[in-house]
Regions:
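Class I SAM-dependent methyltransferase SAM-binding "motif I" and its flanking Rossmann-like core
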Residues: 106-167, 219
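A generic local structural motif
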Residues: 20-24, 84-85, 140-142, 157-161, ...
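Structural signal for conserved beta-strand scaffold positions within catalytic alpha/beta enzyme cores
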Residues: 37, 63-66, 127, 147, ...
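A contiguous loop/helix-start segment that scaffolds small-molecule binding in enzyme catalytic cores
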Residues: 8, 97, 165-233
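Short beta->alpha linker loops
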Residues: 46, 102, 129-132, 159, ...
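Class I S-adenosyl-L-methionine
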Residues: 1-18, 23-124, 218, 223-227, ...
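Short gly/pro/ser/thr-enriched loop/turn and capping motifs at secondary-structure boundaries
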Residues: 42-44, 70, 132-135, 204-206
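Short, surface-exposed amphipathic charged segments that create phosphate/polyanion-binding patches used
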Residues: 75-83, 140-143, 167-170, 209-216
Length: 233
């Protein structure tokens, strides 16, 4: 009899509010025996906390995944390999593993690194889509991301602001918290501060909404999960 190998699922949990999780995500987590979730150096597991607001996870195996915050590609790669190895132990034992991902699993998600490693080793992977932080932020602000059916939309990390602001259409600058002073300076240089809004920690208890970044103090710190929406000027 052929040995069963588990499936590795990338499950999107949305930006913060558990009510934004899809039915597909909830059902997959209900049926998956092993739940893998990123863990910060201080032990925080935000994606797991969000999932617990929608799914009863008691009795399941929780697999913490620790990813390096270093900008060194070699250090990052080593962390991805170690995490993939931990996941594969359960897959080889015939157990499905669901990895929780903030926002949508296809957008700046760590799942993709593990997916590449595990697929190269013959493992089956499945991605379950979800609500992105920038779509939730747009809804929170009550604004459309695209003013018309023909308007382009550019999505980039906040550190790339200076490179993409000249592009036509609206822009989404994700994970902008770390480089916020530089991002605000780029917006100011382009004359787009008043055309820009920011939502920090969208859907979480510590959510902050700034409809006009011209009113934002550049010296004020913003969290890692800061999403900036820039209308076409």
């Amino acid at each position: 009899m052929e040995k069963r190998i588990g499936t590795f699922y990338g499950v999107s949990v949305g930006p913060g509010n558990p009510e934004l999780m899809t039915l597909q995500a909830v059902r997959r987590l209900e049926n998956c025996p092993v739940i893998a979730a990123p863990q910060t150096p201080k032990g925080g597991m935000l994606a797991l906390d969000i999932a617990k607001g929608a799914v009863e996870l008691s009795g399941k195996t929780i697999l913490p995944l620790r990813f390096a915050m270093s900008l060194d590609p070699a250090v990052q790669k080593a962390a991805h390999i170690e995490a993939a190895r931990a996941v594969k132990e359960y897959l080889d034992a015939g157990q499905d593993v669901a990895m929780l991902n903030l926002g949508d699993v296809s957008v700046y998600a760590t799942f993709g690194y593990l997916q590449e490693i595990l697929e190269a080793e013959g493992c089956k992977t499945v991605m379950l889509p979800g609500v992105t932080s920038f779509c939730a932020a747009a809804a929170r602000l009550g604004q459309s991301l695209t003013g018309g059916m023909e308007q382009p939309l550019t999505i980039a990390p906040g550190r790339c602001a200076a490179e993409v602001l000249a592009a036509p259409g609206a822009k989404v600058l994700m994970k902008s918290g770390r480089q916020l002073p530089e991002t605000l300076a780029a917006l100011a240089d382009a004359g787009l501060l008043s055309w820009s809004a920011m939502v920090c920690n969208c859907g979480l208890p510590n959510e902050e909404v700034w409809p006009d970044l011209a009113d934002y103090d550049p010296a004020r710190s913003a969290g890692y999960f800061a999403t900036i929406l820039v209308k076409e000027g």
